[in-house]
Amino acid sequence: MIPGINYPWTIFQGRPNYGCDFGWNKWNSHAGVTAHLDEVRADFESMASAGYEVTRWFVFTDGRGGVDWSPGGELSGVADRFFDDMDAAVEIARSSGVRLCLVLIDFAWLDDPLRRAALESAAFIDRVLDPFLDRYGGDDAIHSYDVINEPDWRPQWPIDNLRAFVGAASNRIHLKSRALVTVGGGRVRSAKEWDDAAYGLDFIQVHSYPDLRYPDRDETVFGRTAADFGLSKPLLIGECPSDPRAHPDGHLSPAYTLADYLNLAREGGYLGAWPWSFKAVDAFGAPAL
């Protein structure tokens, strides 16, 4: 079992720093890792002290930071200071012993047609992923690449497009890196989809946020071993609540504790159960360390 946790982005000047941890952002400002290096290092030291070996960290999210766009809306490459921030993150991961699961993009990337076009063409892979892998592909501080977080929350994007993009990214990562590849599946019921050979994944990932008000919204992981899913690859519970008492308004979590998830993972043959989130970036709170 892999002891892991969702970082998933820093807190900068008291605010969640979603999409702005790496490089210049669309507001022509910089709030990346190197802008608060000591705080990030302290976070990793705390995770290491708590026994975590991998942390899941979002990189380009919805395209607001870390990448450059031409005046016409075409993806042109990584943003200024991106490599400064990622160099620092990789060094901190290496020195702390907490490796990185880097989430390349979030499902919100798919909300804009120009951003989708960058995935449907070779732009993202050739102009963003390739330079990234050329610099970090051989670095063992990176445990894995999560190509896209929860794409099943954007079913409007054709599944053939999703398979083609993730498959191409996976091929490029495997060509240039020893790191593993996954997709952050947003629903338990989607697990079988990620096992399709088109994605080229090394392990399958599902996220579990059961809601007592809507028991039919998704399947449950409880009462099931990883083998019960009938997958050809290992299965990770990549996100789960830290505390059943901490949840957003309008969401009613069952009484499963983080200890229950970890016991399920241990006894059920899962790769692990990674709580959301170390930085308490939303109402689901943070686990006790």
Regions found by a protein language model. Give the residues of each.
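Histidine/acidic-residue-rich catalytic or RNA/ligand-binding cores of hydrolases
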Residues: D216-V221, A246-R266, F284-L289
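Active-site mouth of glycoside hydrolases
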Residues: M1-P210, S232, P244-A259, Y270-P275, ...
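Short acidic/histidine-rich active-site segments
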Residues: L235-P241
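Alpha-helical scaffold elements lining the catalytic groove of polysaccharide deacetylases
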Residues: S121-I125, P215-V221, T225-A226
